[in-house]
Amino acid sequence: MISAAQLLDELMGRDRNLAPDEKRSNVRWDHESVCKYYLCGFCPAELFTNTRSDLGPCEKIHDENLRKQYEKSSRFMKVGYERDFLRYLQSLLAEVERRIRRGHARLALSQNQQSSGAAGPTGKNEEKIQVLTDKIDVLLQQIEELGSEGKVEEAQGMMKLVEQLKEERELLRSTTSTIESFAAQEKQMEVCEVCGAFLIVGDAQSRVDDHLMGKQHMGYAKIKATVEELKEKLRKRTEEPDRDERLKKEKQEREEREKEREREREERERKRRREEEEREKERARDRERRKRSRSRSRHSSRTSDRRCSRSRDHKRSRSRERRRSRSRDRRRSRSHDRSERKHRSRSRDRRRSKSRDRKSYKHRSKSRDREQDRKSKEKEKRGSDDKKSSVKSGSREKQSEDTNTESKESDTKNEVNGTSEDIKSEGDTQSN
């Protein structure tokens, strides 16, 4: 009844008995009441119904729509149903493999027993037959000897014994042939490598076809094919994550290598920068040393220049002083000369003036004498003579004043000329 209900569920659905107004049950493919083996392909319980390998009915839901939903879902072959299905099928194959091995062992054991059982009795029978043959030959020789001697009764008794031995020998020979025929019949059995059933070698083709089309043989053949297919699928599925993992790992390794190269480049750049900074610092120190050396040399040169300039200035000042002293001496000599000249000119002028004065005095004294003479002589003409004498004395005084003025002007010109010569000599000294 359960298998019939499941068949009806597969054909008409689990809600076949519900009324139109009743709510239908929405079962997902991941529900525990759903057969996960059926979702993966087929349920093994459906393969061996009414066979020696019958697994019994499956009480879980077998729904084609649920299997389609599972195949379309994003969790297809990711939940682990396929691995469970593969393990279950491998357990069934392990069971049938054990059955096949037991069948092969049974055939081997029976063949060994048959071969050992046939070889043992046959060998013994052959030995017995050989012994009986030897006895028969010996008895026949004795019978011939007894017959030649005329012992007929003894010969007849021995002939009966020979007949009995021959019958026993024939019985042993017939037994050996029967055992060999039975052993030949047992060797024609074999074991099916798919389902483990015993087959007769050289059996009719119809019986062979019936076996190949049977549920048990087809079920195990399907299980073997499904196991190989699942192994291939799972291998590919495992290779894809492995490949993805490998690609991811390779990508990470490349990134690590790139990071390592970047770190190495940065380290080289930092090292180069440090070296450049060190070189720049060294250059700066060199420049500073050169600058200091230049400043020291410049300072020393300046000091030497100052010394030289001071010495030159001192020399120049000394030469200038000498020149100035010389110019002063010259000026002094010139001034002295001028003063001498002035003094001489003045003395000359004084002498001249004195001489003039003397002359004028003499002249005046003479004039006074004459005037006195005139006064004395010409007392009568005093008025007119006085006028004339006054006019003459005024003209003489004017001439003396003009003479004094000319002498003063000549002295002034001489002083101006001496001053200009002194200024010119000082200019020449400064230019030198």
From Swiss-Prot:
Compositionally biased intervals (Basic residues): 288-301, 312-367
Residue ranges, annotated region (Disordered): 234-432
Subcellular location as annotated: Nucleus speckle
Tissue-by-tissue expression: Widely expressed. Highest levels in heart, brain, pancreas, thymus, ovary, small intestine and peripheral blood leukocytes, as well as cerebellum, putamen and pituitary gland. Lowest levels in lung, liver and kidney. Also expressed in fetal tissues, including brain, heart, kidney, thymus and lung.
GO CC list: nuclear speck; nucleoplasm; nucleus; U1 snRNP; U2-type prespliceosome
Complex and partners: May interact with SFRS1 and form homodimers. Interacts with JMJD6. Interacts with RBM25. Interacts with RSRC1 (via Arg/Ser-rich domain). Interacts with RRP1B.
The name this protein goes by in its record: Luc7-like protein 3
Organism: Homo sapiens
